[in-house]
Amino acid sequence: MSITKVHARTVYDSRGNPTVEVEITTENGLFRAIVPSGASTGIHEAVELRDGNKSEWMGKGVTKAVSNVNSIIGPALIKSELCVTNQKGIDELMISLDGTSNKSRLGANAILGVSLCVARAAAAQKGITLYKYIAELADARQDPFVIPVPFFNVLNGGAHAGGSLAMQEFKIAPVGAQSFAEAMRMGSEVYHHLKILAKEQYGPSAGNVGDEGGVAPDIDTAEDALDMIVEAINICGYEGRVKVGIDSAPSVFYKDGKYDLNFKEPNSDPSHWLSPAQLAEYYHSLLKKYPIISLEDPYAEDDWSSWSAFLKTVNVQIIADDLTCTNKTRIARAIEEKCANTLLLKLNQIGTLTESIEAANQAFDAGWGVMISHRSGETEDPFIADLVVGLRCGQIKSGALSRSERLAKYNELLRIEEELGDDCIYAGHRFHDGNKL
């Protein structure tokens, strides 16, 4: 069944910035998708096309991307008469229309919106759920489906919050839960106790939340953040059942080959900046002291040698985000140079569903894990909930249990788990090997 109408418009993300919403129409009805955006974006990501007109939306308008859907992509898809179940063919047509290596002509935000709509339309045509359709596209097992461990970003720093804290995300992971529903309850309880502790220790404003729903107290160090998180876990009685993850996002504080943990200070002293080896020592001290099971982006996006050296010294999950940008060329290099053992997959880093699935399978084939991720500028679209189940990734991060654009994904996973019943398992301690369960 081919597409009869394509329409895009400007809507708004969770930060109040414009983003692209796309609708396609087939004989089965209308299907919609909204594209997210990032704050700490990697320089190697596919291009999110913004207008750049400072007199409107402070330069963040997406009218060019919207116009590209309505005047270029839409007419070409309708003319092609490609069936909506031909996901690869449609995605390749859009890539060809763009004609650049990073989707800078039409915009990854334009292309991705259409790509996700097409998948929803195809699932409807086949009469199956979106996650089952994605599993078919990826040639992933469906017996049983795997429900992911949620990595809740409960404390925000870095580019996602004010305060002095350099590292961007401090996450909790209920690996000891027996189901996703129980993981949500455990995460909720720890989050609320953390909020109480933050207010007690740093004042009422410490309960204010960052872009991803985590508390954002004005704290200085990772130790301060981790001490408070571990205390909240222990208050709830979940010691050993709820673990911790960190996303350093250090590309924003990488300067002249060193890492400035005081980068938010206007007059940061270069003599205090850390060499890659010194930063590794710091990470090791945190790993010894706290129940950390996952480190994301321990080094900057082009500091390849530091990644490789560090991976040899740890036995926890090391996630590549800015390093790889869901880009198959960079993933291949990271695999070859043994830089990480897990891929962070963000749909809008690469710009089509087909390429995202290929990236996941590329990582799986190398023995890596895959974590599906939201963006800091999110929307109410829960597509990644179906994506993580369809790909059997075993782990997802979509912010804290706060802000509806974050909960939209988690609540959809609750529905999927309930719908599947005995036909699914919770990844739990096997979160890194979800595709092997």
From Swiss-Prot:
GO terms for cellular component: phosphopyruvate hydratase complex. It is an enzyme of class 4 (lyase). The keyword Magnesium applies. GO terms for molecular function: magnesium ion binding; phosphopyruvate hydratase activity. Substrate binds at residues 160, 169, 296, 321, 373-376, 397. The active site is at 212 (proton donor), 346 (proton acceptor). It comes from Saccharomyces cerevisiae (strain ATCC 204508 / S288c) (Baker's yeast). GO terms for biological process: glycolytic process. Signal peptide: none annotated. This is Enolase-related protein 1. It catalyses: (2R)-2-phosphoglycerate = phosphoenolpyruvate + H2O. It holds the Pfam family Enolase_N.
